Each structure stands twice: as C-alpha cells, then as structure tokens.
Amino acid sequence: MTESQRMSRTLAEVDPEIYQAIQHETARQDGQLELIASENFTSEAVLEATGSVFTNKYAEGYPGKRYYGGCEYTDVVENLARERASKLFGAEYVNVQPHSGSQANQAAYGAVVSPGDTVMGLNLAHGGHLTHGHALNFSGKTYKIVPYNVRKEDELIDYDEVEKLAREHQPKMIIAGASAYPRIIDFARFRKIADAVGAVFLVDMAHISGLVAAGVHPNPCEFADIVTSTTHKTLRGPRAGIILAREKYGKEIDKNVFPGTQGGPLVHVMAAKAVCFLEALQPEFAVYQRQVVANAKALAQSLIDAGFRVVSGGTDTHVVLLDVFSKGLRGKESEQALDRARITVNKNAIPFDTNPPMNPSGIRLGSPAVTTRGFKEAEMREVGTLIAEVLTNIANEDVIAGVRQKVQALTTRFPLYSWKRDTVQA
C-alpha cells in the first residue's frame, strides 16, 4: 500500500473503535432529548467546515501578518469570519481566533487588567461562570475578585448591591454575564455603574449570543467595552470563542490572544465560525431564536403547573433553572433518572444552595437543541410533563420506561441529522 493509499482510508478502516464511538454518539444524540442549556446541534455546513483540509494549516499571526507562508486562503477565511461577526453584532473590532470562551475571557482580562487588580463578577453559586472569578480558575488565582449576588427574595441580580460594591472596592473591571441566570441582564445599569467608578465593562454573552444576534435579547455591544462569547450554544456554531470590542482595545486584545495565550489559530474552526455567522445573518435565524425563548417559557410554565419551583419564577432566555431540592430531591439523582428516560440535563447549583456542587439542589434545562429539532410550545409542554413524571417517580423504573417510550416517539417525529439515521447503530 502506498502512502497515498494509506492516507485515503476511511475512519472505519483505520480506527473502528473511534468510528463506532462516533456512530453510537450520533445515535445517542438522535435518540435523546437534549436539554443541556449549553448544547446545540450544528448544521451539516458547520460540520463540513470543521472537518475540512484547513485542519492541516498553521497560521500564527493575523491576516496579512503571518509567521507562515501559504496563508492566502486562511486570510480569506479569517477576514470573512471577522466581517460577518462585526455585521452580526455591530462590533467595531472582532477577534475570531480564541479556541474557547474561557480563552477569550483570559485574553480579555489580560488586555485591560493586571495581576492583583480588582474585578467584579457574578458569583458562580448564583449563576456566574468559572472565569468570572472562581478561586480554582485563572481568574480567581490572578485577580482580586469581588463577587456580586442575586437577591434572596426574587433571585434576580441585585443592582443596588453591585453599585455599592463597586463604589466600595473601585474595581478595574466589572463583568456581566452568566452560565445559569435565566433573566435579561440590565446592561445599561451595569454601564452606568462601571462609568461611575472608572471601570472597564466586560460582558460574557456566551449563553445568549444567538439571542442577541437575532435581536431577541438586548445587545451588549451597545454598552460594553469588551464582549466575549462562545460560538456554540445558542449561536449554533463550532465549539470555540470570539471577542468583540470597541476599536481602542483591539491592539491589546490581539496581543493577548496571540502570542499572549495561544499560538496558531484553528483555521478549520474559524472557517466553521464564518459559516455559523453567515447562517445567523439569515432571517430564519431570528425565527429560530424567538422560538427558543418561547419554548423555554413554555417548558418553565409546564413545570410550574406540575408543582415544581422554577428559580426566579420563570425565564426570559433559553435557560430554565429548576429547584428539585424543594421536592426532596438532589440534582445528581434527578439528572441520572432523567438520563435513564433519555432526557439529558445537568445537575446545577441554585442561588443560596446549601448542598455541595457535585450533588446540588437543582438541574439546569435549556431549549436550544430541541428547538433545532423543530419542537414548539406544544412539544415543550409535553416535555415538561415528562420531566415531572420522572421526578415524581424517581425510583419507579416502570414509570421511567414508559417515559422513555414517549421520548422515543418524540425523537422519531423530529429526527436529528435524519440523513444519518439509516447508517448509525444505537
């Protein structure tokens, strides 16, 4: 066999174990209801770009200023991604090289604050993110973190507390954004608070960027100095990151992405980002995002009607945070029981949680992935009923088996990657 012939073999021929794992994962995604709020399903076009020959290319630097030759088409890809993201979000500056949302945040920190500086962010236990100041994360290890919280009475961000803390601690940067906060964030109020103390205002919109792109959520680019995001989740692109900012921060951000925190960018992933931004610029994307929010609201109301407590009383976004501890349950057992019914969620802390993070008081639900499948409000109400049925019969495997059959009926009605269905093995 020649080297050319060897390189032309299929994955199934070269590595049947990995091939089978992919087949099984495809079947799993097709046969389960994906309700993890941070997950979604990309288009075939995004998958194709991610698996393209740009995987082979090294391209340290930026368009027109590379440290490697042969980057003319890489420059085309990166420029298209930047131009489309700028148009999509109305940003003056764009960097599409970050490998992830966390690395986007790390580069943004490095551009505007120094080690030891004071930074404010939403407490992880109240819905924030690891990179907003958790003690075990680079952010908590490198900077002096002052967390702010939600109010106990309504589980909404306490903007008066944010302002009081900002005036007391004089932070160099204030972060707005969350991983488990279901309500619209008042970016204008944050901007006013940041201006009052001379702080840089950064928004991490990783969870809501798709909603923002479609105009169904306020755009943080109108208020923030720097905006970071992932490109998967609601944006429905590849697993990666992006930074948007006012032009005056561009040079420092560029330096902190490369060479500050990364070497060569993942060109194949930048190509997939460009595709996802183009998809998000289409009118039908706004229709999809409006349905995402409508579906989350329908799911939340269905669970409330079934007697469950939804954190903050509902949702304005794609996220529903469910308090299961009030029903005598814990997040871990709830996640596992729902998984047996082929409903995928994640255990999650709720505000003022007294239970440990690995077995907290809640579960987090999200509507993006099932909306991609075609679910609307009626299906979401049915899903809420199925979740309630499992959680009120958590030790009854007969009930769970019955729910599993109903889930199978739903996934059959709304196939995922239907062109793959006949080729995969469960």
From Swiss-Prot:
The modification N6-(pyridoxal phosphate)lysine is found at K233. It comes from the Bacteria. GO terms for biological process: glycine biosynthetic process from serine; tetrahydrofolate interconversion. Its cofactor is pyridoxal 5'-phosphate. (6S)-5,6,7,8-tetrahydrofolate binds at L124, G128, H129, L130. The keyword Transferase applies. It is found in: Cytoplasm. It catalyses: (6R)-5,10-methylene-5,6,7,8-tetrahydrofolate + glycine + H2O = (6S)-5,6,7,8-tetrahydrofolate + L-serine. InterPro entries: PyrdxlP-dep_Trfase (IPR015424), PyrdxlP-dep_Trfase_major (IPR015421), PyrdxlP-dep_Trfase_small (IPR015422), Ser_HO-MeTrfase (IPR001085), Ser_HO-MeTrfase-like (IPR049943), Ser_HO-MeTrfase_PLP_BS (IPR019798), SHMT-like_dom (IPR039429). The record marks H232 as: Plays an important role in substrate specificity. Its main location: cytoplasm. The keyword Cytoplasm applies. Disulfide bonds: none annotated. Pfam families: SHMT (PF00464). CDD domains: SHMT (cd00378). Keywords: Amino-acid biosynthesis, Cytoplasm, One-carbon metabolism, Pyridoxal phosphate, Transferase. GO terms for molecular function: glycine hydroxymethyltransferase activity; pyridoxal phosphate binding. One of its GO terms (cellular component) is cytosol. Pathway: One-carbon metabolism; tetrahydrofolate interconversion; Amino-acid biosynthesis; glycine biosynthesis; glycine from L-serine: step 1/1. Catalyzes the reversible interconversion of serine and glycine with tetrahydrofolate (THF) serving as the one-carbon carrier. This reaction serves as the major source of one-carbon groups required for the biosynthesis of purines, thymidylate, methionine, and other important biomolecules. Also exhibits THF-independent aldolase activity toward beta-hydroxyamino acids, producing glycine and aldehydes, via a retro-aldol mechanism. Homodimer. Belongs to the SHMT family. HAMAP family: SHMT. This is Serine hydroxymethyltransferase. It comes from Solibacter usitatus (strain Ellin6076). The gene is glyA.
